Each structure stands twice: as C-alpha cells, then as structure tokens.
Amino acid sequence: MKLEIKNLSFAYRDHPVLQDINFDTRPGELLSVLGPNGVGKSTLFRCILGILRDYQGEILLDGREARGIAQREMASMIAYIPQSHRPTFGYTVQDTVLMGVTHRLSPFAAPRAEHVRQAREAMARVGVQDMADRSFAHLSGGEPQLVLVARALCQQSRILVMDEPTSSLDFGNQLRVLACVRGLTQEGYTVLLSTHNPQHALTFSHRILALHDGGVAALGDAGDTLTPELIWQLYQVEVDFVDTQQGRVIVPHRGGSL
C-alpha cells in the first residue's frame, strides 16, 4: 500500500495551515513527522484519514484519490492509533482489539470465531495476550497504547497513523512502544508517526518529514536530514549531535538558547 501526498494545502476558514505539502511513504518504513506546536501535524493526519476532506491537492492510496474511497474501505487501508483512548463502557482488552474488525462486519453482526482468533494473534504480536480479559480502563503505563496497536493490526490495514503516541508515557514505556512499532515495519507495515521528540525520530525512524510555517522544511533519511540546523529552525534550541556505541544522541546546550 502506497500513500502519496501531492501539493496538499488546507485552511481553517481564512487561516492557512498546510501549504503545498509533497511526500510519499514506502512499505516497511517508519516516517516521523516533526514540527513545533500548531504547525499542522494533526491537521495533516486528519486529511489523510479522511476526517477533513475540503483540502486542495491530492491524497492518493495506491493511485486512488482518498476522497473517492468510502470510509469502510478506507478502514481496510489505514488504521489510526490515537494518543489515548477512554472507553465509555468497561470493555476488556480483547473487546477493544476486536473493534478493529468492525468495518468487516454487517450492521448488528457480532464478531465470529475467526475474528477472535485474529484479535488474539494481534495481541500476541505486541505482547499483550495475557491481558485479554482485563479491563482496558484499568491498564497502565504503555499497556493501553500497545492494545491500540493490536487493534490496528486486527483492522488489517497496512498503513498505521500515530499522532504523538508516546506523549503521555514515561521514558521506559515510550521506548517499548516505539520499539514495538519499529518492529512492525519489518513485517511490511508503513508507520506515519508524529512526535515532539527529535531523539525518538532519530533513533527509530527510517525517514523524517519536518514541517515549518505550514510547509515542508525537510524530508529525507533520518540520519542525514536531522541536523542541529534543522532543530534550530523548528524549535529555536541549540543542540550537539554526539556519536555513541548505541547510536547518535542529541544533546541540548545547557546555556544560551534554551
């Protein structure tokens, strides 16, 4: 499944947010979207997901314009993993994951045995199979986010869109969730992920897309594209890049422009 964004622009009434955005995604890659608050990362995702449709330009899925694709079919192509999920009712983890098959069911139909099997396989792939009967509302740490990833896998979409998935997690759970997501790219999944943490983008991404002033500031391989100059342009923070045995680390300056 290939996603192509061509000359995408979007405005809220008279307020332009995105202007002439161009990029594509590749199967088996994690593409991180970076940029300051309010730059349009979430708006970009809402356009891609079909929530916002009054954009200019093209959003193509395997060559088809997204606005011409019905929501049920769109759900078979792209899965959305939000920052958080607060269920209205006391659904179990397995119930939550099974919601990923909704677009494949007729109205009022219940999930069948094959759907339960798919849900259990999805839970096992992200390591939450032992939580199947627990209440989703009682999960903690990175567990809810991993369950939402499992739900997306159960949806059987090949493109996963994640809007700041680790923003509310502690350090350890941030790394666990991102390592899990990066691992999915080895199975051919495409992951489009927004983050405010350049280190996460550098460590886990194949490529980065940097947005600034409504447009594309940079696009390319994470190791080559993410530089001190780009971080200054995006966040007005001075940093150094330090090479370690575990990879390159971004170190902010203690004084000066912080």
How would you name each of these model-derived features?
Residues 234-258:
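ABC ATPase nucleotide-binding domains
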Residues 57-65, 74:
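Conserved ABC transporter NBD signature motif
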Residues 160-164:
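Catalytic Walker B motif of ABC-type/P-loop ATPase nucleotide-binding domains
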Residues 34-36:
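The feature captures the beta-strand-to-loop junction immediately N-terminal to the Walker
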Residues 98, 113-131, 156:
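Conserved ABC ATPase "signature" region
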Residues 135-139, 143:
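Conserved ABC ATPase signature
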Residues 49:
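Helix-to-loop junction immediately C-terminal to a conserved catalytic motif
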